[in-house]
Amino acid sequence: MTYPLDRLPQAGGLTPPQLFADGADLPTISKLAEDPMIDGFTTNPTLLAKAGVSDYEAFARSALEVVGDRPISFEVFADEPAEIVRQARLLAGWGDAVFVKVPVTTTDGTSTHDVVAELAADGVQLNVTALMTPRQVAVVSAALAGGPPSYISVFAGRVADAGRDPLPIMAASVAIMAAEADQRLIWASPREAYNYVQAAQVGCQVITMTADLLAKLPTIGKDLD
């Protein structure tokens, strides 16, 4: 489900993106799982550490129990290709709703293209993350082609933090992925509620938001007079 945009003149007739909740606090995930507006969930190692998660699998299995059949992303901790593959297969085995997050590069900047292609060919549902450019999107989309349903997460907020307009990058990413029906683009690392509107404007299918940003969405279209 989505929040309507018809109260905004600049967004009339646009299709709102699906909403994913971003976080690793289990009570918050449980609460948001009761909200019909939430279409899926994402987590990452930074959020896990912030939430004090010490047993990754126990946390993940508890989260899977409350989110039902909605997609939820769990990220690998590994930074070496063979270990990324091993961890990804392990995480994928935790449930049918699991999408395994794999960063687009390792910490030394090496592309994970081959890892992504191998996992996709093996039927692992992936959420390739931390992308910043349309070139990266094109490479990842090609690696995922022919595999199971997948997501590509572009860090639009970090693009904006670098002083660049994320809209052309997101629009180009949408165009690159248009031919791949099983691939969906995620507007990741949003900084404000207005990013929800911007995602709709460029045709981005999904936006993932932390609980504090999700709480602001009902004010979209509010009369400012």
Predicted regions and their residues:
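Active-site beta->alpha loop and helix N-cap motifs at the rims of alpha/beta catalytic domains
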Residues: 2-8, 13-30, 34-38, 42-118, ...
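Catalytic alpha/beta core domains of metabolic enzymes, predominantly
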Residues: 110, 117, 124-215, 221-225
